[in-house]
């Protein structure tokens, strides 16, 4: 196991946040330890996962594993994300301790639930390609407007939502 990478994942918690207006979401509850894993997806045209975030009540291994899955799934199509295996997640961390080998499966089940939610909404006509294009255009327009105002907000910032920044003891909340 790569402990340095594990520590980095726990400290940075890539993607650890809820998402406002996700295209889809899904959760998995682990009966073995009581952890809840929830994944949120923003899916764009071509079924590309433009953003993926998560929330978990789990420990450091749960957080690290979900962060790894965010890194592996972001920018992939729905089908490519579904093809991510427990072995792929485990390999990204150079293995897991024997007692923690079920963590990749837990996070993957939550991501699969989000994909199933997305597919169900597509099948029911609740999500169309036109809607995905419109959502992408709205985010791009918000980022462009912020750039014109000169506040340095990028399209990625607009997708991410509010940020709390701390500098020299001053706390700033950036709402975009």
Residue spans for each PLM region:
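Structured beta-strand/loop patches that form or line metal/cofactor-binding pockets in enzymes
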Residues: 13-46
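Active-site- and interface-proximal helix/loop "cap" or "latch" segments in soluble metabolic
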Residues: 31-32, 44, 48-105
């Amino acid at each position: 196991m790569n402990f340095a990478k594990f520590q980095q994942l726990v400290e940075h918690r890539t993607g650890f946040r809820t998402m406002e207006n996700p295209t889809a979401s899904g959760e998995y509850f682990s009966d073995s330890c009581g952890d809840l894993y929830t994944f949120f997806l923003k899916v764009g045209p071509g079924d590309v996962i433009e953003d993926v975030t998560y929330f978990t009540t789990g420990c450091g291994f749960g957080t690290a594993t979900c962060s790894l899955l965010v890194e592996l799934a972001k920018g992939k199509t729905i089908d490519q994300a579904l093809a991510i295996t427990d072995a792929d997640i485990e390999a990204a961390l150079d293995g897991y301790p024997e007692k923690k080998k079920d963590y990749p499966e837990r996070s993957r089940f939550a991501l699969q639930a989000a994909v199933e939610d997305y597919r169900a909404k597509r099948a029911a006509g609740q999500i169309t390609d036109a809607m995905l294009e419109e959502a992408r255009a709205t985010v791009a327009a918000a980022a462009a407007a912020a750039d014109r105002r000169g506040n340095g907000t990028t399209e990625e910032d607009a997708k991410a939502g509010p940020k709390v920044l701390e500098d020299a003891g001053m706390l700033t909340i950036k709402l975009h």
